[in-house]
Amino acid sequence: MIDLLWISSDGHPQLFYQFINIPFAFLFHCLSSQGHLSIINRYVYLAMGGFMLAIATMGPYSSLLFLSAIKLLLLIHYIHPMHLHRWILGLQMCWQTCWHLYVQYQIYWLQEAPDSRLLLAISALMLMTQRISSLSLDFQEGTISNQSILIPFLTYSLYFPALLGGPLCSFNAFVQSVERQHTSMTSYLGNLTSKISQVIVLVWIKQLFSELLKSATFNIDSVCLDVLWIWIFSLTLRLNYYAHWKMSECVNNAAGLGVYFHKHSGQTSWDELSDGSVLVTEASSRPSVFARKWNQTTVDWLRKIVFNRTSRSPLFMTFGFSALWHGLHPGQILGFLIWAVTVQADYKLHRFSHPKLNSLWRKRLYVCVNWAFTQLTVACVVVCVELQSLASVKLLWSSCIAVFPLLSALILIIL
């Protein structure tokens, strides 16, 4: 299993590192639930775990995270809560963008491959930006009252289960999970087994698709096969994300995070920290629905940070900020522009066509056609965003699949 996870990482070792984190998260939960760790020691355990994980996986580049954590504590101590969010988000995005631009300088100007440890550190820095900007907004909204003890804030910025993979957890939910730590061991172990099994299945399916892409099936020059190849390639990239998100969810659950107790039914839910279901997301029959389901905690963060706080063109401002957060590579800029246009066109098309769907067969036909359109458009977005460089743009526009983003733009203009 470990070999399978390592092979499937394909230069993105977060999946493997997150798997290695599970025993340490399990130990934390066992010690906490049995009363061997005080609340302060729980925070220390999680923070020290993040500190050591960063050094072990990122080497000297772990300082990117440590400097951000120190800056967070200084700002919390010296800045009034009402002004904290503006300072934290502004400084953190400047710090993160500088490193993104440095990577682009290495790739496009020096023609050098960046250090993999630097790329991992920047990825972790992006996740830290989510956490500390969410924290600062909570301060501004008055949902956090006690800021005299700084250890919970330091731990929240660096705790090891979410350091390399999320999902985003609000500060108040994080504190409640750390301080509670009482769950049924049967439910706990059953949940971990189930989610690890899901990761294995996702990795296995991804490997099958990877082998299919290398097969002789696609050596024939055909428009349909060309479009099919790009769609399968995009699906393979998405499966990598789904496996990584599920593994990160599993690590958080192993540490006792993301659990919710239903008082009325007496049952325990382990899905409070989740970036969504692969089946629900891939079954989305509208681009706008897919956009809301994809990487759900990040979508909620973008809605909270940008969409709900912007009066002019909130949709395009949100996708623009997402491109900035991801690194502003040429492919990413094009990919998020395509996605924004497609989602806006979907809203217009739905308002136009919905009154005309007055029979069952029309509704089913509309759903089927729109699902295929969603899949092919998302394929264009994912290829651009993931390949990042101008090569992704060339790959996209040399294929007939480029018709679908253009069709979205046409719908947006006409309707």
From Swiss-Prot:
InterPro entries from the UniProt entry: LPLAT_7/PORCN-like (IPR049941), MBOAT_fam (IPR004299)
Lumenal side: 1-6, 59-61, 104-122, 215-227, 327-328, 386-394
Free-text description of this protein's post-translational modifications in UniProt: Not glycosylated.
GO BP annotation list: lipid modification; peptidyl-serine octanoylation; response to food
Gene Ontology terms: cellular component: endoplasmic reticulum; endoplasmic reticulum membrane
Annotated transmembrane regions: 7-28, 43-58, 62-78, 85-103, 123-138, 194-214, 228-247, 313-326, 329-345, 365-385, 395-415
Keywords: Acyltransferase, Endoplasmic reticulum, Membrane, Transferase, Transmembrane, Transmembrane helix
Topology Cytoplasmic: residue spans: 29-42, 79-84, 139-193, 248-312, 346-364
Active site: N295, H326
Enzyme Commission number(s) of this protein: 2.3.1.-
Catalysed reactions, semicolon-separated: octanoyl-CoA + L-seryl-[protein] = O-octanoyl-L-seryl-[protein] + CoA; decanoyl-CoA + L-seryl-[protein] = O-decanoyl-L-seryl-[protein] + CoA; L-seryl-[protein] + acetyl-CoA = O-acetyl-L-seryl-[protein] + CoA; L-seryl-[protein] + butanoyl-CoA = O-butanoyl-L-seryl-[protein] + CoA
A GO MF label: serine O-acyltransferase activity
Membrane topology per record: Multi-pass membrane protein
Superkingdom of the source species: Eukaryota
Subcellular location: Endoplasmic reticulum membrane
Main location group: endoplasmic reticulum
Enzyme class: transferase
UniProt similarity note: Belongs to the membrane-bound acyltransferase family.
Quaternary structure and partners: Monomer.
Function: Catalyzes ghrelin acylation at 'Ser-3' using preferentially octanoyl-CoA, hexanoyl-CoA and decanoyl-CoA as acyl-CoA donors leading to ghrelin activity. In vitro uses also acyl-CoA donors of different lengths from short-chain (C2) to long-chain fatty acids (C16) knowing that acyl-CoA donors from butanoyl-CoA (C4) to dodecanoyl-CoA (C12) are more efficient compared to longer acyl-CoA donors, such as myristoyl-CoA (C14) and palmitoyl-CoA (C16) that are not efficient.
Designated name of the protein: Membrane-bound ghrelin O-acyltransferase mboat4
Species name: Danio rerio
Gene label: mboat4
